[in-house]
Every structure is written in C-alpha cells, then in structure tokens.
C-alpha cells in the first residue's frame, strides 16, 4: 500500500511539474493544438492573432461576458465561487457563475470535456498554475485564440473571417455580441451562405444559435455597461486600438487560406442543394 501511494505521489508531482513547465513555455509559444481540439476530432481551423490586433469591442465583450473579474482579480479560481459551484453540482443545480477565463483556458489546453468532479478539481489546480506562469494579458490572448466558435473553427482570427469576412481588428460591437452568443454551443454555429452567423429558425442549429445570440445581445451590453465598457481594456493594461496598429506578425489581416477553402466548399454545396 505504501509503495502504491509513493508511486501515485511521484506520478502526480511529475504531471504537476510537466503542466507548470508547459504553462511557462506559453510565454513564448503559441500552442498549435489543444486537448479540446483533439477530443473534438475533425479539422482544426486555427490561426493565431496577437491581442493588439483584436478589436477593443471584441476584447471588452469577452471580458464582460466571460470573466469581469479578470482585470482586477487575476487568480486562477475565485474559491468562494468555486465552492458554491461545487455545492450546486452536488445538488444537481445549475452552475451559478460559470468558469472564469483562466480556468476555461487551462481545461481547453490540457483536459477533456466533462462535468466529472475530479475534472473540476483539476480545472482549479491547473488554473492556479496557469496564472502564476503567464500574465493576464497573455491569458486573454490565448483564450481568444483557443476558444471554439464553430464545429471546426477555433480562435478569433478564423471566426471573424469565416462569419463576417473581416479581420479581428475590424469587428463591430454587434458582431462581438454575436460571437459571444456562439461560445456556449459552438458545434451548432454555421455561416450563412451570404455571410454572417446562421440564425434561421427553420433549422435546428439555426434555432439554437438564434436563441443563444439573442440572449447574448441582451445580456452582454448590460454586463458591459455595468463593468465599465471599454475601460475594461485600461484595467487590463491594453492601450492598442487594433485597427491603427501597423502590419506585423499575428495581425491576421488576410483571410486564412483554410477559411477561404471552407467558405468556397460550403458555397458549392449550397449551390448544389438549392
């Protein structure tokens, strides 16, 4: 029994060290793929965009909708909220808060989709490691690059070009609201043949996305106003206006080739079936 416990302790410490080393490497490395992408299978349309080239509207909407405490309370987990979430889970109640951005990012990078209590504990442990390894600006940048916005669409670069035909530095506030509506259930999100997000109530997926986007269009502006609007960027230490930045690495100002191919394939398919 003692040998088994020692073995488990060694395994845990080894994994803990490996996770910490990986998170530290994220200061310089952009992960080409995540555990979440691999679990989903299929293609991974995933092109990197630097935070300074993301529209202030997109950044502010993301913070207000996903984690308004990120600018001022940079911890992996709010432990009071986490305990309330655990209690709600044990009571089979709805999660009263949702996961903060560091926790979402940590699980997307290294874990599998599940509501298992063990996975939730790992979420919290990894999130705490993550915030001690990289800055809050880098956490937000990685989150915007790893979040899923469609069945095979990952990150703001591919999402803005796919749905709107525009780079992420040119996204409007209303478009940002729509993308926030996609986040809860990205597997149901599709592009309209003419561009934009399909919200056709006559189709099951369109009906789902219509409801989620309408919900986001109601709540995100309210949250944004309550949390200080674009002042959230100042609190994050972000001064870039995105569109005025000169071209450079990670600007995502050209449509990714894979996105161009996907749109063309969908248009051909739509022409055949119409």
Label the predicted regions.
Residues 1-274:
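Juxtamembrane regions of bacterial inner-membrane/periplasmic proteins
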């Amino acid at each position: 029994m003692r040998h088994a416990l020692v073995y488990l302790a060694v395994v845990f410490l080894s994994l803990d060290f490996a996770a910490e080393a990986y998170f530290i490497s994220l200061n310089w490395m952009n992960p080409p793929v995540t555990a979440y992408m691999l679990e989903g299978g299929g293609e991974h349309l995933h092109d990197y965009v630097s935070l300074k080239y993301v529209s202030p509207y997109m950044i502010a909407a993301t913070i207000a909708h996903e984690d308004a405490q990120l600018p001022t309370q940079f911890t992996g987990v709010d432990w009071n909220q986490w305990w309330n979430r655990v209690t709600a889970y044990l009571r089979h109640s709805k999660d009263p808060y949702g996961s903060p951005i560091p926790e979402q990012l940590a699980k997307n990078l290294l874990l599998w989709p599940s509501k298992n209590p063990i996975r939730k504990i790992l979420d919290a442990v990894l999130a705490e490691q993550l915030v001690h390894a990289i800055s809050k600006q880098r956490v937000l940048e990685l989150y915007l690059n790893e979040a899923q916005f469609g069945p095979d669409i990952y990150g703001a670069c591919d999402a803005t070009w796919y749905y709107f035909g525009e780079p992420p530095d040119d996204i409007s506030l209303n478009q940002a609201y729509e993308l926030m509506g996609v986040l809860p259930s990205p597997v149901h999100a599709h592009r309209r043949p003419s561009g934009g997000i399909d919200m056709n109530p006559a189709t099951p997926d369109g009906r789902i996305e219509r409801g989620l986007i309408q919900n986001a269009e109601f709540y995100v502006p309210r949250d944004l106003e309550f949390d200080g609007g674009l002042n959230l960027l100042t609190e994050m230490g972000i001064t870039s206006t995105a569109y005025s930045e000169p071209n450079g690495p990670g600007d995502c100002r050209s449509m990714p080739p894979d996105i161009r191919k996907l749109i063309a394939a969908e248009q051909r398919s739509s022409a055949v079936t119409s």
